[in-house]
Protein backbone atom coordinates (compact mmCIF):
# COMPACT_ATOMS: atom_id res chain seq x y z
CA UNK A 1 0.00 0.00 0.00
CA UNK A 2 1.25 3.49 -0.85
CA UNK A 3 2.58 5.45 2.13
CA UNK A 4 1.46 9.09 2.06
CA UNK A 5 4.38 11.48 2.61
CA UNK A 6 3.43 14.31 4.95
CA UNK A 7 5.56 17.38 5.71
CA UNK A 8 4.72 20.23 8.07
CA UNK A 9 6.29 23.69 7.92
CA UNK A 10 6.23 25.94 10.99
CA UNK A 11 6.65 29.59 10.03
CA UNK A 12 5.51 31.14 6.76
CA UNK A 13 7.89 34.05 6.44
CA UNK A 14 10.33 34.44 3.53
CA UNK A 15 12.08 31.15 4.16
CA UNK A 16 9.18 29.01 5.37
CA UNK A 17 7.01 29.97 2.41
CA UNK A 18 9.81 29.16 -0.01
CA UNK A 19 10.42 25.82 1.70
CA UNK A 20 6.77 24.94 1.14
CA UNK A 21 7.00 26.06 -2.48
CA UNK A 22 10.20 24.06 -3.08
CA UNK A 23 8.65 20.93 -1.59
CA UNK A 24 5.59 21.42 -3.80
CA UNK A 25 7.52 22.13 -7.00
CA UNK A 26 9.77 19.10 -6.54
CA UNK A 27 6.89 16.79 -5.63
CA UNK A 28 8.61 15.73 -2.40
CA UNK A 29 5.43 15.64 -0.28
CA UNK A 30 1.93 14.31 -0.88
CA UNK A 31 0.54 16.50 1.88
CA UNK A 32 1.82 19.85 3.19
CA UNK A 33 0.71 21.20 6.57
CA UNK A 34 1.49 24.90 7.08
CA UNK A 35 1.55 26.76 10.41
CA UNK A 36 2.07 30.40 11.33
CA UNK A 37 0.88 32.61 14.17
CA UNK A 38 -0.28 35.13 11.53
CA UNK A 39 -3.54 33.59 10.33
CA UNK A 40 -3.91 35.93 7.35
CA UNK A 41 -0.37 35.16 6.18
CA UNK A 42 -0.64 31.38 6.37
CA UNK A 43 -4.09 31.50 4.73
CA UNK A 44 -2.63 33.52 1.84
CA UNK A 45 0.33 31.17 1.43
CA UNK A 46 -1.95 28.11 1.41
CA UNK A 47 -4.18 29.71 -1.23
CA UNK A 48 -1.19 30.70 -3.38
CA UNK A 49 0.19 27.16 -3.29
CA UNK A 50 -3.20 25.65 -4.05
CA UNK A 51 -3.47 27.96 -7.06
CA UNK A 52 -0.21 26.41 -8.31
CA UNK A 53 -1.44 22.81 -8.29
CA UNK A 54 -2.16 22.72 -12.02
CA UNK A 55 1.50 23.47 -12.74
CA UNK A 56 3.37 21.12 -10.39
CA UNK A 57 4.41 17.46 -10.83
CA UNK A 58 1.90 15.91 -8.43
CA UNK A 59 -1.43 16.74 -6.86
CA UNK A 60 -0.49 17.73 -3.31
CA UNK A 61 -2.91 18.28 -0.45
CA UNK A 62 -2.19 21.60 1.29
CA UNK A 63 -3.57 22.12 4.79
CA UNK A 64 -3.86 25.38 6.75
CA UNK A 65 -3.11 24.59 10.41
CA UNK A 66 -2.77 28.23 11.58
CA UNK A 67 -1.28 27.91 15.11
CA UNK A 68 -2.79 24.49 15.84
CA UNK A 69 0.60 22.82 16.09
CA UNK A 70 -0.80 19.53 17.34
CA UNK A 71 -2.18 18.96 13.83
CA UNK A 72 1.41 18.45 12.64
CA UNK A 73 1.82 15.32 14.78
CA UNK A 74 0.76 13.18 11.80
CA UNK A 75 3.68 14.41 9.67
CA UNK A 76 6.74 12.38 8.69
CA UNK A 77 8.90 15.52 8.70
CA UNK A 78 8.39 18.92 10.30
CA UNK A 79 10.47 21.87 9.12
CA UNK A 80 11.00 24.58 11.73
CA UNK A 81 11.33 27.86 9.85
CA UNK A 82 10.02 30.20 12.56
CA UNK A 83 12.03 33.40 12.59
CA UNK A 84 12.22 37.13 11.98
CA UNK A 85 14.65 37.89 9.20
CA UNK A 86 15.02 41.59 10.05
CA UNK A 87 16.69 40.64 13.34
CA UNK A 88 19.42 38.76 11.46
CA UNK A 89 20.44 41.67 9.23
CA UNK A 90 24.09 41.59 10.26
CA UNK A 91 24.43 38.35 12.18
CA UNK A 92 22.45 35.10 12.49
CA UNK A 93 22.77 35.44 16.27
CA UNK A 94 20.39 38.41 16.04
CA UNK A 95 17.41 36.03 16.08
CA UNK A 96 18.63 34.20 19.20
CA UNK A 97 15.90 35.31 21.61
CA UNK A 98 13.08 35.41 19.05
CA UNK A 99 13.59 31.93 17.61
CA UNK A 100 14.29 30.20 20.91
CA UNK A 101 11.16 31.80 22.40
CA UNK A 102 9.18 30.70 19.34
CA UNK A 103 10.34 27.09 19.68
CA UNK A 104 9.07 27.05 23.26
CA UNK A 105 5.54 27.75 21.98
CA UNK A 106 5.24 24.69 19.74
CA UNK A 107 7.98 22.04 20.11
CA UNK A 108 6.69 20.22 23.18
CA UNK A 109 3.08 20.54 22.03
CA UNK A 110 3.92 18.68 18.82
CA UNK A 111 5.86 15.92 20.56
CA UNK A 112 3.22 15.52 23.27
CA UNK A 113 0.60 15.13 20.52
CA UNK A 114 2.37 11.96 19.37
CA UNK A 115 4.81 13.16 16.71
CA UNK A 116 7.25 10.38 15.81
CA UNK A 117 8.87 11.81 12.70
CA UNK A 118 11.92 13.93 11.93
CA UNK A 119 12.44 17.58 12.86
CA UNK A 120 14.39 19.58 10.26
CA UNK A 121 15.23 22.93 11.83
CA UNK A 122 16.45 25.87 9.78
CA UNK A 123 15.72 28.71 12.24
CA UNK A 124 18.79 30.68 13.31
CA UNK A 125 20.98 30.46 15.24
CA UNK A 126 20.48 26.96 13.91
CA UNK A 127 22.71 25.01 16.29
CA UNK A 128 21.26 26.65 19.39
CA UNK A 129 17.66 26.07 18.25
CA UNK A 130 18.40 22.40 17.51
CA UNK A 131 20.00 21.94 20.92
CA UNK A 132 16.96 23.66 22.43
CA UNK A 133 14.50 21.37 20.60
CA UNK A 134 16.30 18.37 22.07
CA UNK A 135 16.45 19.97 25.51
CA UNK A 136 12.78 21.06 25.56
CA UNK A 137 11.27 17.82 24.34
CA UNK A 138 13.66 15.02 25.31
CA UNK A 139 13.19 13.85 21.72
CA UNK A 140 15.58 11.37 20.11
CA UNK A 141 18.46 13.65 18.99
CA UNK A 142 19.02 11.55 15.87
CA UNK A 143 15.57 12.67 14.75
CA UNK A 144 16.46 16.36 15.03
CA UNK A 145 18.42 17.58 12.01
CA UNK A 146 19.63 21.15 11.63
CA UNK A 147 20.25 22.58 8.18
CA UNK A 148 23.47 23.88 9.72
CA UNK A 149 26.34 24.24 7.26
CA UNK A 150 24.60 22.35 4.46
CA UNK A 151 24.08 25.47 2.36
CA UNK A 152 27.46 26.87 3.40
CA UNK A 153 29.07 23.65 2.14
CA UNK A 154 27.32 24.15 -1.20
CA UNK A 155 28.69 27.69 -1.30
CA UNK A 156 32.17 26.35 -0.53
CA UNK A 157 31.99 23.86 -3.41
CA UNK A 158 30.78 26.59 -5.75
CA UNK A 159 33.70 28.84 -4.82
CA UNK A 160 36.22 26.01 -5.20
CA UNK A 161 34.60 25.15 -8.53
CA UNK A 162 35.17 28.68 -9.80
CA UNK A 163 38.84 28.42 -8.88
CA UNK A 164 39.64 24.96 -10.29
CA UNK A 165 37.15 24.54 -13.14
CA UNK A 166 35.49 21.36 -11.82
CA UNK A 167 31.74 21.01 -11.28
CA UNK A 168 30.72 21.69 -7.66
CA UNK A 169 28.83 18.38 -7.76
CA UNK A 170 32.18 16.61 -8.20
CA UNK A 171 33.83 18.33 -5.24
CA UNK A 172 33.64 16.75 -1.78
CA UNK A 173 34.24 19.58 0.70
CA UNK A 174 32.48 20.72 3.85
CA UNK A 175 31.98 23.77 6.01
CA UNK A 176 31.74 22.59 9.62
CA UNK A 177 30.96 23.94 13.08
CA UNK A 178 28.48 26.67 13.91
CA UNK A 179 26.19 27.93 11.15
CA UNK A 180 27.50 31.47 11.55
CA UNK A 181 30.65 33.57 11.39
CA UNK A 182 32.74 31.00 13.30
CA UNK A 183 32.18 28.18 10.80
CA UNK A 184 35.22 26.91 8.91
CA UNK A 185 36.19 24.93 5.84
CA UNK A 186 37.66 21.46 6.42
CA UNK A 187 40.20 21.77 3.59
CA UNK A 188 42.45 18.97 4.82
CA UNK A 189 39.60 16.50 4.17
CA UNK A 190 38.45 18.06 0.87
CA UNK A 191 38.74 15.88 -2.24
CA UNK A 192 38.11 15.81 -5.98
CA UNK A 193 37.87 12.38 -7.63
CA UNK A 194 39.10 10.82 -4.41
CA UNK A 195 42.29 12.91 -4.37
CA UNK A 196 42.95 15.39 -1.60
CA UNK A 197 42.99 19.03 -2.65
CA UNK A 198 46.46 19.49 -1.21
CA UNK A 199 47.76 16.62 -3.36
CA UNK A 200 46.17 18.07 -6.47
CA UNK A 201 47.65 21.48 -5.72
CA UNK A 202 51.12 19.96 -5.36
CA UNK A 203 50.77 18.04 -8.64
CA UNK A 204 49.25 20.84 -10.70
CA UNK A 205 49.52 24.20 -8.96
CA UNK A 206 48.53 26.16 -12.07
CA UNK A 207 45.09 24.55 -12.00
CA UNK A 208 44.45 23.68 -8.37
CA UNK A 209 46.30 26.25 -6.26
CA UNK A 210 44.09 28.94 -4.72
CA UNK A 211 43.84 31.01 -1.55
CA UNK A 212 42.03 28.79 0.95
CA UNK A 213 41.27 31.65 3.33
CA UNK A 214 39.69 33.71 0.56
CA UNK A 215 37.45 30.85 -0.56
CA UNK A 216 36.48 30.02 3.03
CA UNK A 217 35.48 33.63 3.65
CA UNK A 218 33.39 33.74 0.47
CA UNK A 219 31.53 30.62 1.59
CA UNK A 220 31.12 31.94 5.12
CA UNK A 221 29.66 35.28 4.04
CA UNK A 222 27.74 34.21 0.94
CA UNK A 223 24.40 34.57 2.66
CA UNK A 224 25.13 38.16 3.61
CA UNK A 225 25.94 39.06 0.00
CA UNK A 226 22.45 37.83 -0.88
CA UNK A 227 20.91 39.68 2.06
CA UNK A 228 22.50 43.02 1.18
CA UNK A 229 20.58 43.26 -2.08
CA UNK A 230 17.19 41.79 -1.12
CA UNK A 231 17.08 41.90 2.71
CA UNK A 232 16.49 38.17 2.95
CA UNK A 233 17.71 34.80 1.73
CA UNK A 234 15.09 32.37 0.52
CA UNK A 235 15.68 30.21 -2.57
CA UNK A 236 18.91 28.44 -1.68
CA UNK A 237 18.08 27.83 1.98
CA UNK A 238 14.63 26.55 1.00
CA UNK A 239 16.14 24.12 -1.50
CA UNK A 240 18.69 23.05 1.11
CA UNK A 241 15.90 22.23 3.56
CA UNK A 242 13.95 20.40 0.85
CA UNK A 243 17.07 18.35 0.11
CA UNK A 244 17.20 17.12 3.71
CA UNK A 245 13.47 16.31 3.63
CA UNK A 246 13.96 14.27 0.45
CA UNK A 247 16.88 12.37 1.98
CA UNK A 248 14.64 11.40 4.90
CA UNK A 249 11.51 10.50 2.95
CA UNK A 250 13.41 8.52 0.31
CA UNK A 251 15.65 6.86 2.91
CA UNK A 252 18.64 7.89 0.81
CA UNK A 253 21.43 7.36 3.34
CA UNK A 254 22.84 10.55 1.82
CA UNK A 255 25.93 12.26 3.21
CA UNK A 256 25.08 15.89 3.93
CA UNK A 257 26.61 18.53 6.16
CA UNK A 258 24.04 19.00 8.92
CA UNK A 259 23.80 20.11 12.51
CA UNK A 260 23.55 17.11 14.82
CA UNK A 261 24.24 16.25 18.45
CA UNK A 262 27.92 15.93 19.27
CA UNK A 263 28.69 12.82 21.30
CA UNK A 264 32.47 13.10 21.43
CA UNK A 265 33.33 13.85 17.80
CA UNK A 266 36.61 15.80 17.75
CA UNK A 267 36.26 16.20 21.52
CA UNK A 268 32.89 17.96 21.47
CA UNK A 269 29.64 16.86 23.09
CA UNK A 270 26.29 18.08 24.37
CA UNK A 271 25.51 20.57 21.59
CA UNK A 272 24.35 20.42 18.00
CA UNK A 273 26.80 21.54 15.34
CA UNK A 274 27.67 20.64 11.75
CA UNK A 275 29.69 17.70 10.51
CA UNK A 276 29.02 15.38 7.53
CA UNK A 277 26.13 13.07 8.43
CA UNK A 278 24.45 10.06 6.84
CA UNK A 279 20.76 10.94 6.62
CA UNK A 280 17.91 8.51 6.01
CA UNK A 281 14.41 7.62 7.16
CA UNK A 282 15.43 7.43 10.83
CA UNK A 283 17.22 10.77 10.75
CA UNK A 284 20.96 10.99 11.40
CA UNK A 285 22.33 7.46 10.99
CA UNK A 286 26.03 8.23 11.33
CA UNK A 287 28.27 11.24 11.97
CA UNK A 288 31.71 11.41 10.35
CA UNK A 289 34.66 12.77 12.29
CA UNK A 290 36.90 14.46 9.75
CA UNK A 291 40.69 14.42 9.63
CA UNK A 292 41.37 18.06 10.55
CA UNK A 293 44.59 20.02 10.66
CA UNK A 294 45.62 21.51 14.01
CA UNK A 295 44.42 24.89 12.80
CA UNK A 296 41.06 23.46 11.72
CA UNK A 297 40.58 21.53 14.96
CA UNK A 298 41.26 24.66 17.00
CA UNK A 299 38.76 26.55 14.85
CA UNK A 300 36.16 23.82 15.32
CA UNK A 301 36.50 24.02 19.11
CA UNK A 302 36.19 27.82 19.01
CA UNK A 303 33.10 27.51 16.84
CA UNK A 304 31.50 25.07 19.27
CA UNK A 305 32.34 27.36 22.17
CA UNK A 306 30.40 30.13 20.44
CA UNK A 307 27.31 27.89 20.49
CA UNK A 308 27.81 27.28 24.23
CA UNK A 309 28.16 31.05 24.74
CA UNK A 310 24.88 31.70 22.93
CA UNK A 311 23.08 29.11 25.05
CA UNK A 312 24.45 30.79 28.18
CA UNK A 313 22.59 33.99 27.21
CA UNK A 314 19.21 32.28 27.56
CA UNK A 315 18.35 32.93 31.20
CA UNK A 316 15.34 30.58 31.15
CA UNK A 317 17.52 27.63 30.13
CA UNK A 318 17.89 25.02 32.87
CA UNK A 319 21.66 24.77 32.68
CA UNK A 320 21.89 21.96 35.22
CA UNK A 321 19.51 19.78 33.21
CA UNK A 322 21.31 20.80 30.03
CA UNK A 323 24.72 19.84 31.43
CA UNK A 324 23.32 16.53 32.71
CA UNK A 325 22.41 15.51 29.17
Annotate each language-model stretch with its function.
Residues 137-143, 152-325:
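C-terminal substrate-binding/catalytic lobe of Rossmann-fold NAD(P)-dependent dehydrogenases
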Residues 92-157:
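Rossmann-like NAD(P)(H) cofactor-binding subdomain of soluble oxidoreductases
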Residues 12-13:
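Glycine-rich Rossmann-fold phosphate-binding loop(s) that bind the pyrophosphate
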Residues 37-75, 312-316:
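Conserved N-terminal Rossmann-fold NAD(P) cofactor-binding segment
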Residues 55-118:
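Rossmann-like NAD(P)-binding element
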Residues 23:
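Aromatic pocket-lining residues of Rossmann-like dinucleotide-binding sites
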Residues 16-17:
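N-terminal Rossmann-fold NAD(P) dinucleotide-binding loop
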